[in-house]
Regions:
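Metallocofactor- and cofactor-centric catalytic cores in central/energy metabolism, strongly enriched
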Residues: 1-410, 417-420, 425-496
Length: 496
C-alpha cells in the first residue's frame, strides 16, 4: 500500500505528507489516529500534537523553529506559523562522535583519463577560458568555429566559458577570480585549454601565468588579443594545435577511489530530505568507503545543522576550522545587515520547507555519516580524500562552480523544483519526486522519487552507483547534451 505520510525521526512532532492529504482524512501515527482539519499538500508538514505559542517544531529529530501561535493537532503547519530559532554568532563545543561506516570495499573501476601529472579526469575537453569579460565574444566565436571544423571528433566537447570579471576588481574579489580561473585551467577534465586575455585588465596575463604555478605547457596556451593582429586567426591556429594533442588521449581503467564528487541541492522541496539528499548521503558514504572523495558546500544552508557536521570532524583542528567556516559566513551576512535565517526561497516554501533549519537539516543529509576530513576556503583545491567541507554560498551557479573548481569531477545536484543549470563539469540532476522527473526529462538524469514509492533506498543506491560509474566513464548527462554549461564567481566587494 502506498505510504501517504512519513515520520522521519521517532522524536518528530510532525509528519510529512507524501501525497496530497484531504481535510477529514484520518492518519494513524505511532498507534494514534489523527483527523486532518484541513487539506495538506504533498511535501508539507502535519502537526501530531497541539502546539503552544513558542513551542519547538521537531523534524529530523531536531528543532526547525518554533510555533508563532498556538496550532492544533492535525493542522498543516508551514512558514506562516513557524519562525526560525537562528540568531547571530554562536560559541560551539566539540562533542566528537564515533563513526563506523561498515561498508565493504568493492573492486570497482571507471574509464577515465590519466593526465601527465598523475591526476585523473572523467572528460577530455578543449576549453577556452577568458581572463577578463571583455573577450567573451571572441571566445564564443572561437569555440563555435572549432566545433564546426572538427565536429568534436576525438574529444568530449569544445567549450567556451565566459564570465564578467577579471577587471574593475580589488582585494578578495580579484583574488577569487584568479583562483577560480586557475582551478579551471588545472582541472583534469580539460585535455587542453586556451586562455584568452585582452591585455590591459587587472588580471594581467603575465602575472596570472605565474599565479597558475606548475601546468602542462603542451596543453595550456595563452593568447593576448591586444598583442596579435587577427585574434580569430591566431586563436584558431593555437586551438588546432591543442585539439590535435587532446584527441590522442584515451580512457583507461581507474579505481573508483580516484573519483571526486560535489554534493549540491537547489530548488529543494519537502521531499529533498527524504529521498534525493539521503540517497546522495548513502552514495557519499559508499564512495568514501572505497577511498573516494565528496565535497559539501552551501555554507549558509548548514546554519541550523552545523553542530552535526562539527561533531563529525575527525580532529579538534578540523572542528575549529568548521566553526570558522560557519561563523565567517554569518559575519558576512551580519556585516551587510542581513539576518542569518532568511534563506528559504519562494520555491522552497511552496515545496514544503518552512525555515532555514528545516532546509539545513535536509541539505546536510547529502553528506551521509562519514567523518569530516577536510575544510577548504573558497577557491582552494582538494588536498585530502574523504568528506570535505568547502566555503561557498548557497547560490546554485556560484556553489556548483566552486565545487567543480576545487577538483570535483562531477556535481551531484538534487532538486525538487527543477533547474536546467550546469557548470563546467557534468552536473547530474537528481529529482526528489517522480512528478518532476516525468515532467522535465530534458533536465532530470536520475529519479530518487521512487524511494517513497516502495523502492528500498539500498536498491535505488545500487542503481545510482551503476549510473555514476557510467557517467564517469563518458555517458553524458543532460546539461552536457543540451550544452547548458556556465560558470559564476563569488563577488563580495566593490566594482570600480
Amino acid at each position: 500500500m502506498e505510504t501517504k505520510y512519513l515520520k522521519i525521526n521517532p522524536a518528530d512532532n510532525v509528519v510529512v505528507a507524501i501525497s496530497d492529504l484531504k481535510a477529514g482524512e484520518a492518519i494513524t501515527v505511532d498507534g494514534h489516529a489523527i483527523t486532518l482539519k484541513e487539506d495538506v499538500p504533498a511535501g508539507h508538514k502535519v502537526t501530531l500534537k497541539d502546539f503552544a505559542q513558542g513551542e519547538n517544531i521537531i523534524k529530523y529529530g531536531y528543532p526547525i523553529g518554533h510555533a508563532v501561535t498556538a496550532v492544533e493537532q492535525g493542522r498543516w503547519i508551514n512558514e506562516t506559523q513557524i519562525k526560525t530559532n537562528l540568531a547571530g554568532l554562536l560559541d560551539y563545543t566539540y562533542n566528537p562522535v564515533s563513526v563506523d561506516l561498515n561498508i565493504p570495499k568493492k573492486d570497482l573501476t571507471f574509464k577515465g583519463y590519466r593526465r601527465k601529472n598523475g591526476d585523473v579526469g572523467i572528460r577530455n575537453e578543449v576549453w577556452i577560458i577568458p581572463t577578463v569579460g571583455c573577450v567573451n565574444g571572441i571566445i564564443g566565436q572561437l569555440a563555435e568555429a572549432l566545433r564546426r571544423e572538427t565536429n568534436c571528433e576525438g574529444v568530449d566537447a569544445i567549450v567556451a566559458f565566459p564570465h564578467n570579471y577579471g577587471c574593475s576588481q580589488l582585494g578578495d574579489d580579484h583574488e577569487n577570480t584568479k583562483k577560480i580561473l586557475r582551478d579551471m585551467i588545472l582541472h583534469p577534465n580539460a585535455g587542453a585549454v586556451l586562455i584568452v586575455s585582452l591585455g590591459c585588465e587587472n588580471n594581467q596575463p603575465d602575472v596570472f601565468r605565474e599565479f597558475l604555478g606548475d601546468y602542462d605547457t603542451d596543453r595550456v596556451k595563452f593568447m593576448v588579443t591586444q598583442k596579435v593582429g587577427d585574434e580569430f586567426e591566431e586563436g584558431m591556429k593555437i586551438l588546432r594545435e591543442l585539439y590535435a594533442k587532446a584527441k590522442t588521449d584515451v580512457r583507461e581503467d581507474v579505481p573508483l577511489s580516484e573519483l571526486r564528487v560535489g554534493l549540491k541541492c537547489g530548488g529543494s522541496d519537502g521531499f529533498s530530505g527524504i529521498t534525493a539528499n539521503p540517497l546522495l548521503g548513502m552514495f557519499s558514504d559508499f564512495l568514501i568507503a572505497q577511498g573516494g572523495t565528496s565535497v559539501l558546500t552551501e555554507v549558509p544552508e548548514m546554519f541550523g545543522a552545523e553542530t552535526i557536521l562539527m561533531n563529525r570532524c575527525r580532529t579538534k583542528e578540523l572542528f575549529e576550522q568548521t566553526v570558522h567556516l560557519i561563523n565567517d559566513f554569518k559575519e558576512y551576512f551580519l556585516s551587510h545587515g542581513e539576518p542569518v535565517g532568511e534563506n528559504p526561497s519562494p520555491g522552497n516554501k511552496a515545496g514544503g520547507i518552512s525555515t532555514l533549519e528545516d532546509k539545513a537539516l535536509g541539505c546536510t543529509q547529502k553528506c551521509g555519516k562519514a567523518y569530516v576530513d577536510g575544510v577548504m576556503g573558497y577557491g582552494d583545491r582538494l588536498k585530502v580524500k574523504g568528506l570535505n567541507l568547502l566555503s561557498a554560498p548557497g547560490n546554485d551557479l556560484v556553489a556548483a562552480t566552486a565545487l567543480a573548481s576545487c577538483g570535483c569531477h562531477m556535481v551531484l545536484f538534487t532538486t525538487g523544483r527543477g533547474t536546467p543549470f550546469g557548470t563546467f563539469v557534468p552536473t547530474m540532476k537528481i529529482s526528489t519526486n517522480s512528478t518532476l522527473a516525468k515532467n522535465k526529462p530534458r533536465w532530470i538524469d536520475f529519479n530518487a522519487g521512487v524511494i517513497v514509492e516502495n523502492e528500498p533506498m539500498e536498491k535505488t543506491c545500487e542503481r545510482f552507483i551503476d549510473y555514476i560509474i557510467r557517467v564517469a566513464s563518458g555517458e553524458p548527462v543532460n546539461n552536457e547534451k543540451k550544452n547548458y554549461r556556465e560558470i559564476a564567481i563569488f563577488k563580495t566587494g566593490v566594482t570600480l
